[in-house]
């Protein structure tokens, strides 16, 4: 299934000229049917992943591809794998990678089917809504190299519980939970007001060396 260009917010081809994460949301191609990880959440997620040039990273539940683009901007010379079971999300991720001048292997699949075939990686991020959160996280942990970083973004308390219990059962280290509550300004006739966005939980951990 191809995304109709007319359904997207059309923007001219460009590249992000900075090393810092947090590319403005409006610079991405978007669709109302595919969620985008907001720029402030992306910036924090990238910091939790602890990326550097040459790393290999898996993005499970890539959605619009905004986080995949941010990852590619940090791991120049490395490799990125983006996975989603939604065909429109995969097409949108490819569009955003192209418009920012990055390359990644974008895979239309259920994560449980494709993760066993991917190489071991330095970092993995899991987002979106999956039917079997625990199994996907277990498989993700098995793909992490020693000292590899796992980051999970979720808006659901139930998913956070599943993630944390799985992480603790796997004896990961440096386990951290950060709740992100962002408010953005909006200009109104009488001044500027702040509009709150949905809280996001960012769970991060490190795979031990032994």
Feature annotation, model-predicted:
Residues 64-76:
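Conserved SAM-binding loop of SAM-dependent methyltransferases across substrates and taxa
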Residues 139-197, 201:
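C-terminal substrate-binding/active-site "lid" region of AdoMet-derived donor-dependent transferases
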Residues 120-128:
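Short SAM/SAH-binding signature in class I
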Residues 2-53, 58, 92-95, 99, ...:
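Class I SAM-dependent transferase core
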Residues 61:
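Conserved S-adenosyl-L-methionine
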Residues 83-121:
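S-adenosyl-L-methionine
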Residues 77-81:
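Short beta-strand element of Class I
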Residues 131-139:
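A short, conserved alpha-helix within the catalytic core of class I
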């Amino acid at each position: 299934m191809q995304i109709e260009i007319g359904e997207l917010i059309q923007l001219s081809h460009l590249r992000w000229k900075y090393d810092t994460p947090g590319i403005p949301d409006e610079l991405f191609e978007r669709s109302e049917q595919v969620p985008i990880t907001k720029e402030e959440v992306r910036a924090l997620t990238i910091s939790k992943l602890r990326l550097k040039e040459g790393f290999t990273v898996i993005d499970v539940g890539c959605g619009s591809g905004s986080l995949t683009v941010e990852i590619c901007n940090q791991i120049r010379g490395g490799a990125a794998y983006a996975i989603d079971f939604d065909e429109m999300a995969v097409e949108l991720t490819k569009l955003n990678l192209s418009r920012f001048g990055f390359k990644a292997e974008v895979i239309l699949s259920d994560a449980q089917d494709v993760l066993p075939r991917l190489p071991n990686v330095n970092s993995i991020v899991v987002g979106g809504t999956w039917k079997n959160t625990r199994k996907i996280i277990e498989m993700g942990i098995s793909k992490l190299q020693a000292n590899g970083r796992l980051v999970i973004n979720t808006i659901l308390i139930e998913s956070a519980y599943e993630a944390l219990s799985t992480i603790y059962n796997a004896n990961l280290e440096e386990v951290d939970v950060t709740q992100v509550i962002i408010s953005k300004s909006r200009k109104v006739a009488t001044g500027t007001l702040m509009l709150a966005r949905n809280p996001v939980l960012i769970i991060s951990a490190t795979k031990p060396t032994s």
